[in-house]
């Protein structure tokens, strides 16, 4: 379980190793806010040990795009870090012990894994039952699948689902400064808690943990708009409500054969 103390420790390691600290991390620390990436990274820090065989599905060029140092620590800590991705981006990932270019359905390794992670991958999956069946095949009995993805009914996701695909990169480039080769078609078939429970449950997984992660990053490139997001988040949290923009983080343990 990730604690506030653990998050703060990793926050300092992530943002305060190089001085001066940027205005955005300082602002988030002032508000006591940790973004979804921070929480995902801290969660994996609690799950990865020296005997962990880890498969990162859809890994691309980065295990943690915003935290290479932490990704390197976990890559050195685990026994195996294997990456799987049909994109050529996987060739640029320097931390993988093993890399496989292809789809999860066609992946036939000689081992099973203690942990399989899907970081911002679930929203692109067009065949959820097929993917879940492959995850059950790849995961050891008692092993975990960690799914970190966007929420289907968040404002940005709704707009994205209505917009033509060519517009996705234009918006992502403007707001998050991403590269075109990191933009892929979206499906949003595994992007609610109910859908994840149903799909993963049918494949023999039980939900071990689940969190809605408030996401105040839509306008984080600009100080004023980021401040407005954080103020709004603080007000909503004070009355027990989530911020409208959220991500999903679910951990699913393989407990039985698929139904």
What are these regions (language model features)?
Residues 8-47:
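Class I SAM-dependent methyltransferase Rossmann-like catalytic core
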Residues 30-31, 58, 182-184:
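Short, contiguous strand/loop micro-motifs
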């Amino acid at each position: 379980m990730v604690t506030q103390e653990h998050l703060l420790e990793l926050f300092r390691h992530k943002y305060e190793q190089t001085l001066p600290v940027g205005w955005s991390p300082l602002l988030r620390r002032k508000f006591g806010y940790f973004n979804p990436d921070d929480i995902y990274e801290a969660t994996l820090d609690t799950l990865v040990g020296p005997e962990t065989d880890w498969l990162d599905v859809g890994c691309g060029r980065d295990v943690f795009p915003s935290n290479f140092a932490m990704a390197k620590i976990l890559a050195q800590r685990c026994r195996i870090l294997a990456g799987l991705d049909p994109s050529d981006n996987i060739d640029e990932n320097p931390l993988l012990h093993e890399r496989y270019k292809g789809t999860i359905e066609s992946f036939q390794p000689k081992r099973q894994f203690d942990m399989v992670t899907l970081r911002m991958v679930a929203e692109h999956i067009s065949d959820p039952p097929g993917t879940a069946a492959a995850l059950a095949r790849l995961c050891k009995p008692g092993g975990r699948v960690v799914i970190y993805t966007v929420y289907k009914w968040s404002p940005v996701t709704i707009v994205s689902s209505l917009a033509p695909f060519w517009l996705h990169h234009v918006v992502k480039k403007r707001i998050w400064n991403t590269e075109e080769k990191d933009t892929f078609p979206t499906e949003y078939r595994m992007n609610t808690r109910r859908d994840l429970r149903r799909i993963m449950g049918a494949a023999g997984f039980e939900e071990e943990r689940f969190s809605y992660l408030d996401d105040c990053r839509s306008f984080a490139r600009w100080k004023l708009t980021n401040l407005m997001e954080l103020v709004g988040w603080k007000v909503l949290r004070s009355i027990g409500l989530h911020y409208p923009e959220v991500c999903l983080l679910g951990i699913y343990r393989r407990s039985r054969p698929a139904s």
